[in-house]
Amino acid sequence: MSHNQFDKKSQAWSALFSEPMSDLVKRYTASVFFDKRLWQADIAGSLAHADMLAAQKIISSEDHNAIQSGMATISAEIESGAFDWKLELEDVHLNIEARLTQLIGLAGKRLHTGRSRNDQVATDVRLWLRGEIDLIGALLTDLQKALLEVAEKNVEVILPGFTHLQVAQPISFGHHMLAYVEMFSRDAERMSEVRRRTNRLPLGAAALAGTSYPLDRERVAVSLGMVDEKGHPCVCQNSLDAVSDRDFAIEFTAAASLCMVHISRMSEELILWMSQNFGFIKIADRFTTGSSIMPQKKNPDVPELARGKTGRVVGHLMGLITLMKGQPLAYNKDNQEDKEPLFDTVDTLKDTLRIFAEMIGGQLNPATGIKEGGISVNPQAMEQAALKGYATATDLADYLVKKGLPFRDAHETVAHAVKAAITHQVDLSELPLAVLQQFNPGIEKDVYEVLSLRGSLNARDILGGTAPNQVRAQIARHRARLG
């Protein structure tokens, strides 16, 4: 076949076929306009493969040098926007290979020795996803640090804690923020685990059965950084599995879905808290929009969209699982459909993490070195909401238990006290001692220390509790972890 096979034939394998591919089928099967984002991974994998082929004397040093030079030219063309992506060449891999062959001739054809697009694409996606996971890990750190800053400023601010969206017990607003730090720290751990399993080399598996060429797969793995924590090469051990499974992409999307679920839960609270009915917080105007008809409105579009985009990412997870579930070994064209949901999941998660870190923690003003525009807290509104909800009722029950009353009896006694407070439209702490003693004569003046919001907060002085000194200990632990 001539050097110009990619120009004269619709595909690299078309000598077998008696008629060309129709334009409709070309458009239907092409992936180049979304998988071209893999170009850096594709070139990196090809260069590592070429290095190994030369070291194994499978290609000459002259061909090796030509491949390196050609790939440098292609990289420059892509970066400058001069590269001509062609639909008829179907994907990123054949586009780059065709251009390489055009630039350097026969040496470009020899690059594919011992390699199939099946192991090539699996390698590219793993390399690309590894880099994206690293970026996501850094963004998760930024978001956690933003939450820590808010927590540190609001350790002493009292927020009504809720169960069933009913006022339950008073908590530190800082403690509440730290709950999300814990969630995002686990998300970061999951991403790290996904990265470890993603960072394995399929290249050398060829189409499905391996190759008869004496490839040094471990050399390629090391050169691409596909190594474990001790520097040992990580190579896919079964050629069928290497080219056919996309569990690493599914696992990443599952981890991303969990992260988005945590963001969605936080979004729901931000939306509630900034509503007029709560009035607990404000977010900077740049994260809100107005109404086309109601001039008084500031709508929380960013958290609302994040809540909505969570469904989109979870949908991608279901799509990928469904994509894989019916495929026999080894590679099938179905797997081309893994890229758009994977790419969109990565883009959505990165964008969401970036915007939430800024929305919560603010943006650094380079002139002053001070962060501006983060969450603005209304402590008075929070405290009033806690008082209205009889948030210290459990504290009164605990007080009676310490006086010797069984908890179930204490629970019933306090229910009567709350009923009396509701009738008189006062907080429990505002009921006269004589009234409280009607429910249990063992109640004494010290009960008012227990019934105060501050007293309730301070009483939860246990590891993981909401007492301010425990919250500060949590903050210190997270700061040490995040650096």
UniProtKB/Swiss-Prot annotation:
GO BP term, pick one: L-arginine biosynthetic process
Record keywords, A-Z: Amino-acid biosynthesis, Arginine biosynthesis, Cytoplasm, Lyase
GO MF annotation list: argininosuccinate lyase activity
Compartments reported by the entry: Cytoplasm
Enzymatic class: lyase
Pathway: Amino-acid biosynthesis; L-arginine biosynthesis; L-arginine from L-ornithine and carbamoyl phosphate: step 3/3
Enzyme Commission code(s) on record: 4.3.2.1
InterPro entries recorded: Arg_succ_lyase_C, Argininosuccinate_lyase, Fumarase/histidase_N, Fumarate_lyase_CS, Fumarate_lyase_fam, Fumarate_lyase_N, L-Aspartase-like
Ranges in coiled-coil conformation: none
Cellular component, GO annotation: cytosol
Catalysed reactions, as listed in the record: 2-(N(omega)-L-arginino)succinate = fumarate + L-arginine
Source domain of life: Bacteria
Pfam families the UniProt entry points to: ASL_C2, Lyase_1
UniProt similarity note: Belongs to the lyase 1 family. Argininosuccinate lyase subfamily.
Official protein name in the record: Argininosuccinate lyase
Origin species: Albidiferax ferrireducens (strain ATCC BAA-621 / DSM 15236 / T118) (Rhodoferax ferrireducens)
